């Protein structure tokens, strides 16, 4: 009789343990952070000319699905500022600050290490790779040029100062608005059950040339960015 009672007790314990182990398939996530971008182009023929990194803001919402074991696929929508500084430090030095805003749709594939947050609590690490499509929504430029290279502006001393928003309807510089790129990164997080918290790093490399084919330049020019983010997620 004691063996029967013991078997029943063990059965209830096992059921209790299984009830506590929740298995999820989906995750919805919100994240925000800092972007650091630069224009990747050849300026070797221009003396003392540089493109420098400037910080911006990024935010995203997305969903992820646990395909099998530790493998997951995700997609979402992201806002990212790809800002950078152009400087010419020659005899007549000048600079331009570029504030570029994009809306992107990323698609990524990730693999969880240490713990699988869809099955268990604890610390996890997720390397991931993916691609993205993005749309160039707006560009704002601010800076100054030497007066002797431009006409039609009222200058302050020997320099012309300006602060303008680019008109994409005219698109005089023949900029592309639809672009593609690839990304790779890593996230480190902790699963509390239904809730995850994490920090991450991503490097984004632009596949698309920023100019249209009819543009007068033959130089390769792409925008590359590093994103550092913090995020929270809910699983179901």
Feature map (PLM): residue ranges:
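Extended, basic/helix-rich recognition subdomains
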Residues: 189-212
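Residues on the lipid-exposed face of transmembrane beta-strands in outer-membrane beta-barrel proteins
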Residues: 30-34, 57-65, 77-79, 105-111, ...
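Short loop/turn motifs that connect adjacent beta-strands in outer-membrane beta-barrel proteins
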Residues: 20-25, 69-70, 114-124, 140, ...
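Extracellular/periplasm-exposed beta-strand and loop segments of Gram-negative cell-envelope proteins
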Residues: 38-54, 81-103, 135-179, 207-229
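N-terminal hydrophobic signal/anchor transmembrane helix of membrane proteins
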Residues: 64-66, 70-73, 79-85
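Hydrophobic, well-structured mid-protein blocks that either form specific transmembrane helices
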Residues: 97-139, 143
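Short glycine/proline- and aromatic-enriched beta-strand/turn motifs that initiate or cap beta-hairpins
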Residues: 20-60
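Bacterial Sec-dependent N-terminal signal peptides
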Residues: 1-27, 228, 232-236
């Amino acid at each position: 009789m004691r063996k029967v009672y013991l078997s029943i007790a063990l059965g209830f314990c096992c059921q209790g343990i299984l009830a506590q182990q929740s298995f999820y398939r989906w995750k919805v996530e919100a994240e925000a952070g800092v972007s650091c971008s630069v224009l990747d182009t050849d300026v070797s023929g221009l003396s003392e000319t540089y493109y420098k990194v400037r910080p911006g803001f990024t935010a995203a919402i997305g969903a992820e699905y646990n395909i099998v074991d530790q493998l997951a696929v995700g997609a979402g929508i992201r806002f990212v500022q790809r800002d950078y500084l152009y400087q010419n430090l020659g005899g007549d030095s000048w600079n331009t600050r570029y504030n570029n805003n994009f809306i992107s749709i990323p698609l990524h594939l990730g693999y969880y290490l240490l713990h699988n947050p869809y099955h268990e609590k604890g610390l996890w690490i997720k390397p991931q790779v993916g691609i993205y499509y993005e749309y160039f929504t707006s560009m704002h430029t601010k800076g100054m040029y030497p007066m002797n290279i431009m006409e039609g502006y009222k200058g302050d001393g020997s320099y012309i100062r300006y602060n303008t928003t680019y008109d994409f309807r005219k698109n005089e510089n023949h900029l592309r608005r639809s672009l593609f790129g690839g990304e790779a990164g890593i996230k480190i997080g902790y699963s509390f059950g239904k809730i995850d918290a994490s920090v991450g790093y991503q490097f984004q490399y632009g596949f698309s040339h920023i100019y249209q084919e009819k543009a007068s330049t033959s130089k390769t020019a792409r925008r590359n960015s590093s994103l550092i983010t913090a995020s929270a997620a809910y699983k179901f």
